[in-house]
């Protein structure tokens, strides 16, 4: 059978990746080498239940799994989900409009080698008091790609403590709920990469950074009086690259893009734009390289040698990319659609919220129709025929010549593998 064009392109990309196997084509930064559940078993999520056989909670409760979906829709959870080590979650495999998890938060503490893609995690006011929508306090090598995170009751997405080698890329970190309303703490010496993300409608901590950090091609919109990028505000030493980002003031914004730096925060800065005028046009300008423009941090002249992006966009390119592709963008849900519309109002729309009902809650999703999968190995029969595997034999976890499993080859063919 003739291979489809997307699958042919995907196979070619994987063949080139043999010598330097990253989590998936397009994985970058400190967390790019996460292996997920590649050496384990497949788990197919077959229902939208909070718990039990076939549920997402059950899927991530054991180590060494690649999780795919034969169902789409909103999964309502009452308690936090705790993810085990070496788990891959491939939300792009869900039919219909994909997966939203709503009602409480997730813990990735000690979830070494996690790979998480194309899923929406929306906590909400009914979630655990004082908890993050997503949080990591310990663990090594994790990557989060095209994730939409919102409505945390403490932080929205925080990385703290002994966590190391983490990447968050192509994601949306939105609307931490009032009165706290925080984007997130990024506070570890172990290395965190933040690439091409959107921080939006968080009163403060967009993000608050301490330790070792690469912050490239992000868009920060409508931060509140607590601050946009908060530069440590600490006695601890910090070392960051801050490159090609765009800060756009919105209706809630009353302070400058960078605040609360000091001599302990060492920043290499280059080509960051700031649009403060809320005039309905994207017409910002480059921030001059001075400590005063960057919240009082200590400006350094040489870039830190951290794992960098393959291609550095201009700030304007970053805005175009983020508004089109950030978050669980295979199919944008009603929440992300509203958030992107706020950004594209260029300063005239946006709000800090205390109740997700303001956004219509998590909305409704088309569950779609699962493709036929005779052997139940997570790859639809038609895709197996194209891959050369057997639709009647559970063989999706066999390794392709690229080093990825056939399940990963198929799943990654469903979404773009490059961003430029």
Swiss-Prot record:
Catalytic reaction annotation: Eliminative cleavage of (1->4)-alpha-D-galacturonan to give oligosaccharides with 4-deoxy-alpha-D-galact-4-enuronosyl groups at their non-reducing ends
Entry keywords, A to Z: Calcium, Carbohydrate metabolism, Cell wall biogenesis/degradation, Glycoprotein, Lyase, Metal-binding, Polysaccharide degradation, Secreted, Signal
Residues making up the signal peptide according to the UniProt record: 1-20
Residues linked to a glycan: 49, 165, 202, 394
InterPro entries: EF_Hand_1_Ca_BS, Pectin_lyas_fold, Pectin_lyase_fold/virulence, Polysaccharide_Lyase_1
GO molecular function, one term: metal ion binding
Record-listed Ca(2+) binding positions: 275, 277, 279, 281, 286
Record-linked Gene3D superfamilies: Single-stranded right-handed beta-helix, Pectin lyase-like (2.160.20.10)
Role summary: Pectinolytic enzyme consist of four classes of enzymes: pectin lyase, polygalacturonase, pectin methylesterase and rhamnogalacturonase. Among pectinolytic enzymes, pectin lyase is the most important in depolymerization of pectin, since it cleaves internal glycosidic bonds of highly methylated pectins. Favors pectate, the anion, over pectin, the methyl ester.
Family label: Belongs to the polysaccharide lyase 1 family.
Protein name per its UniProtKB record: Probable pectate lyase C
Organism annotation: Neosartorya fischeri (strain ATCC 1020 / DSM 3700 / CBS 544.65 / FGSC A1164 / JCM 1740 / NRRL 181 / WB 181)
Lineage: Eukaryota, Fungi, Dikarya, Ascomycota, Pezizomycotina
Name of encoding gene: plyC
């Amino acid at each position: 059978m003739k291979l489809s064009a997307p699958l042919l392109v995907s196979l070619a990309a994987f063949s080139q990746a043999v010598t330097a196997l990253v989590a998936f084509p397009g994985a970058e930064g400190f967390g790019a080498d996460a292996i997920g559940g590649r050496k384990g078993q497949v788990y197919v999520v077959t229902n939208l239940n909070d718990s039990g056989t076939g549920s997402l909670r059950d899927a991530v409760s054991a180590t060494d799994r690649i999780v795919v979906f034969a169902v789409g829709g909103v999964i309502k959870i009452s308690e936090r989900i705790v993810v085990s080590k070496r788990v891959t979650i491939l939300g792009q495999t869900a039919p219909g409009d994909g997966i939203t998890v709503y009602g409480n938060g997730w813990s990735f503490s000690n979830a070494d080698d996690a790979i998480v893609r194309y899923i929406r995690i929306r906590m909400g006011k009914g979630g655990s008091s004082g908890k993050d929508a997503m949080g990591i306090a310990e663990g090594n090598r994790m990557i989060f790609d095209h994730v939409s995170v919102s409505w945390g009751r403490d932080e929205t997405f925080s990385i703290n403590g002994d966590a190391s080698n983490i990447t968050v890329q192509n994601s949306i970190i939105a609307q931490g709920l009032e009165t706290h309303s925080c984007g997130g703490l990024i506070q570890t010496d172990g290395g965190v990469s933040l690439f091409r993300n959107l921080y939006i409608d968080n009163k403060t901590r967009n993000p608050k950074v301490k330790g070792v950090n690469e912050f490239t091609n992000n868009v920060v919109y409508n931060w509140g009086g607590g601050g946009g990028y908060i530069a440590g505000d600490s006695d601890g030493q910090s070392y960051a690259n801050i490159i090609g980002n765009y800060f756009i003031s919105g209706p809630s914004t009353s302070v400058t893009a960078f605040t609360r730096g000091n001599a302990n925060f060492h920043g290499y800065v280059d080509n960051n734009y700031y649009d403060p005028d809320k005039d309905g046009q994207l017409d910002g300008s480059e921030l001059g390289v001075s400590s005063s423009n960057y919240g009082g941090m200590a400006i350094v002249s040489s870039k830190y040698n951290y794992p960098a992006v393959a291609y550095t966009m201009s700030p304007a390119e970053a805005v175009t990319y983020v508004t089109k592709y950030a978050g669980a963008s295979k199919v944008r849900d009603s929440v992300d659609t509203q958030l992107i519309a706020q950004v594209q109002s260029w300063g005239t729309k946006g709000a800090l919220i205390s109740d997700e009902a303001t956004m219509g809650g998590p909305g409704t999703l088309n569950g779609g129709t699962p493709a036929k999968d005779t052997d139940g190995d997570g790859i639809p029969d038609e895709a197996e025929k194209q891959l050369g595997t057997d639709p009647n034999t559970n063989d999706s976890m066999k390794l392709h010549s690229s080093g990825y499993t056939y399940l990963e080859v198929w799943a990654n063919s469903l979404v773009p593998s490059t961003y430029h």
